[in-house]
Amino acid sequence: MNGRKLPDGGVLYDDTDESEDDIEVEGDASVAAPLAATVDWNAGSLNETGLLGAELIGEFVKRLPNSPGVYRMFNAEGDVLYVGKARSLKKRVNNYAVGRVHSNRIAQMVRQTANMEFVTTRTETEALLLEANLIKRLRPRFNVLLRDDKSFPYILITGDHRAPAIFKHRGARARKGDYFGPFASAGAVGRTINSLQRAFLIRTCTDSVFETRTRPCLLYQIKRCSGPCTHEVSDGGYGELVQEAKDFLSGKSQKVKSHMAEAMNQAAEDLDFERAAIYRDRLAALSHVQSHQGINPAGVEEADVFAIHHEGGISCIQVFFFRTGQNWGNRAYFPKADPQLSSAEVLNSFLAQFYDDKPVPKQIMLSQTVEELELLAAALSEKAGHKVSMLVPQRGEKRDLVDHVVGNAREAHGRKLAETASQSRLLEGFKETFGLAYAPQRIEIYDNSHIMGTNAVGGMVVAGPEGFVKNQYRKFNIKSTDITPGDDFGMMKEVMTRRFSRLIKEEGIPDRTAQVATPDAADMPFPTWPDVILIDGGQGQMTAVRAILAELGITDSVTAIGIAKGVDRDAGRERFFPPGRESFTLPPRDPVLYFIQRMRDEAHRFAIGSHRARRKKEMIKNPLDEIGGIGPSRKRALLQHFGTAKAVSRAALSDLMAVEGISEAVARQVYNHFHDDAAK
């Protein structure tokens, strides 16, 4: 079935270059999810009659009203084939039943339809928003599907502390403060924050670290922070720095730079060359930020610009983000769509899904018009709570901007075609090398990472015809207490057991007798069965892995291959352990060898990154984290009131009750936690 929830134990991979400034917030759900979750569907219940295809749809039409709404089409297995919306459900669905000539895609969908459901909505705009939300959640086979739909990163300047900090942020806006974005990539946010640190000397440490400082850290020494933790700068002076940073991010960059230039010149006139050099370096940092922004049209204050290039069965949609008159990056998308669809149809469906869980700007510019331009504008205006203008510029600065985005879309499309062709050849070579029945469409690569058994993490990365599928990466925190510290075999055994036990429970064991490859990994919701699993390990690891696969009864359902490091652990001398044959090596310049090395190295990188994140979290753990009922808000309130966790532990019950947001019951819980420990 499509549309299952992600497993509770699954952790989506956050593709960030740096994690030091990340704030991870749980509950980053689609803003429109409640809309879909509360839908009261009118089931067709016509599959009991044995009707299929156009005959079933014809019977279903008799029950449909002439009102706007959304309909779903199912196959015999209960998988959602298609989600559509209509101004008139009866007229729209009837088109599938009449004897008109359909495209191959529609004809195939109609033939497979074994059941249908519908729901009415008050307006067509409401139907459009619901349709987009359902397509993203259910990922129906015959719809245009938005891939790589990870949330965008923002810059957060906190507003709940005497010394605001600057962080990279993804997810729900749960913390008080000013959010600036969206940025196209985490790398762009990281570069911007680094430059803003040099320009405005704002802290990037967590509140718990801030409260425990007794002297300035290294960032103060290298002039990347003004040292508010130990009052190296007054609260008023620090507040001015923070306000300047907000002004710069709000588009008032010229005002900020002029103020700094005046201060630099004044310092030079006063012969205070050291202070003048500081202002010079801060100005250079701001110029560095702007140098990475590329094109910055003066007439575009807040807009997203979309351009599509459709060729060779692949569509590339390029998006540029402009906020406060600044270019905050761009990103290329490659939606899954039927090659017979026009570029306008692909773009139309893409736009509704794109803004399902993202803030909508005041203006959206397109490279070409779409059929439902006015309806989309009305729906997005209703969702955003402000007027959204959608236009296709014909001349002037905005047309030049759109042409620039079109050029980027064309270049990204060309690169994608080349990469896809190369990946296809490598997968075919992989098949020949290991004697597989078909070229694998989903390869899962596993690796463990730990230091003497501590903070052990298992990592899983996924590769397919379009490269690495990062939204399918998972990490497994090793939980078993029976594993001897440093026992790699035991750790891999736990990872395999958890991964495939859950998979069997939710998906069942696949029938591999047909020898047909699974769909492209990027198109399948998680969880789904892999064709091949690669294990970073030799004969010992593979013995443990194959024992688990045999115990679960899935030895014939998935091909397990081990990769042992070569002599002296040299790259290029790896030994492979496939099932049912002797181990072997590949020639040093074999493209398949490079392909496997790249997959193994990616699994290694991901596992190490997950381990480091877990270890870092363990190192900076605060004693307040161990108290049940003390979440981030109460923890922050206690630290702001008392300064340090040690001061909290020494506080009297009456002092704890005096903290804003701390009830008597919570205060008593905190007091008992520390004093019960002391008594022991």
Swiss-Prot record:
The keyword DNA damage applies. GO terms for biological process: nucleotide-excision repair; SOS response. The gene is uvrC. It comes from the Bacteria. Keywords: Cytoplasm, DNA damage, DNA excision, DNA repair, Excision nuclease, SOS response. Its main location: cytoplasm. This is UvrABC system protein C. It is found in: Cytoplasm. Belongs to the UvrC family. Residues 66-144 form the GIY-YIG domain. The UvrABC repair system catalyzes the recognition and processing of DNA lesions. UvrC both incises the 5' and 3' sides of the lesion. The N-terminal half is responsible for the 3' incision and the C-terminal half is responsible for the 5' incision. GO terms for cellular component: cytoplasm; excinuclease repair complex. Pfam families: GIY-YIG, HHH_5, UVR, UvrC_RNaseH, UvrC_RNaseH_dom. NCBIfam families: PRK00558.1-5, uvrC.
